[in-house]
Each structure stands twice: as C-alpha cells, then as structure tokens.
Amino acid sequence: MRVFLDWFNEPADSAALDGLLRAGLSHLWFETIHPFADGNGRIGRAILDMAISQDAKSASRLHGLSIQILTAKTEYYAALNGAQRGAGDVTEWLAWFTNTFAESCETSLRLIDEALVRTRFWSANKDIALNPRQRKALIRMLAAGAGKFDGGMTPRKYMALTKANNRLTANRDLSDLVEKQLLVRGGAGRSTYYNLALPGWGWVPRGSRTT
C-alpha cells in the first residue's frame, strides 16, 4: 500500500503516462491490494475521480464514470479480474476502462442536452394554461428522457399518475394538450398513445419507423 501511495502522490505532471491511463492503473492497483474489509469499491471509484480531476486540473466532474461503472458491473468485474489474474498485461483492462470513460462522457452529454431541452420546453410554453394534472404528466414524461417514456402516455397511465377521476377527464386533458401542441397523438382506438411534441423524444412502437 505504501508503494501505491508513493506512486499515486507523485505530481501527476511528472508521470510519463497519459492521465487517463494513470487513473485506470490507480483503480486497478488499489482494487488489487483490497486493503479494507469493506468499502474498497467506493474508495477505488473515488481514487478514479481524483486521478481524472488531477489530469484535467479541475474539481468539476462531467463524466459520470462511477455511475457508468455501476451500471456495467458484470463487464467491470470481468475486466478487473482478468487483469488481476493475468501475467501483468493490463491492456484489456485499460481498453475497457477508456471505452467506459468515453461512454460515460457521452451519457453525461446526453443528460445535459436533455436538461436543456426540458428547460427550453417550459420556457417556450410558460404562458400556456395547464391544470395540475396536465403539468404533472408533462413533468413525468420529460423526466423519463428522450424516447424513454415506454408505451407513451395513455389514458390509463394518465389516470394512475394524476388521479384523474375518470377516463373522460383523462381523454379531455390529453386532447387539450394535443390542441396546445404539447403532445402528439399516435396509434388509434385502444392502442392510442401520446408523445411529447419534441423531435426525437417520442416513444416509437417496436417495428415502426421513426419519423
């Protein structure tokens, strides 16, 4: 552990090693030592964040790497164990790590873009009168993210979400949102669903072509 700390605490600028690779090696080294009975994963991810911040010379984190790792636990442990059990070749681990870092950056950019879309949506429609049920439904659909409100909004979902008294009220509210150009209607009859009137944000039934 002392050897690891001495290496890690060397000025990042002095290391003849790419900063991102240094971060990946730091995490691998610490997790291989596994110095504590509990909490090694959390500390290892904190070391990752610290190493990347040192390389970027910024305390701001826009990459969301820890979250990306937690969402890919199976692949993470496979890559980590492969490096730990190998003959010292960490190429595959570093390849997995750098690819995951790139994916985390792309995810963060998407989340930022979605947050901007939500802000612009409410700003553009701030003068449109909405009842509390309609506003709650729109907030839930926006929070789901682009194309991720599975199945679109339906009268049944609307009633469950907003506690609308009956199907007639739900249909009336949804039709009003269509007239106000906040939602678009898809399907027909019992298969009718509603999407946000935002390009790229609509749920598309499997087998249908995106428009």
Where are these regions (language model features)?
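Phosphate/pyrophosphate-binding active-site loops
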Residues: 1-112
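Anionic ligand-binding catalytic core segments
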Residues: 70, 148-149, 211
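Short alpha-helical segments that sit at the start of domains
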Residues: 112-144
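Short acidic, hydrophobic short linear motifs in intrinsically disordered regions
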Residues: 147-161
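Core residues of bacterial helix-turn-helix
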Residues: 162-163, 187
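Short amphipathic alpha-helical interaction segments
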Residues: 164-176
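Glycine-centered, phosphate/nucleic-acid-interacting loop/turn motifs that mediate DNA/RNA or nucleotide
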Residues: 181
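Short, cationic-aromatic polyanion-contact patches
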Residues: 185-210
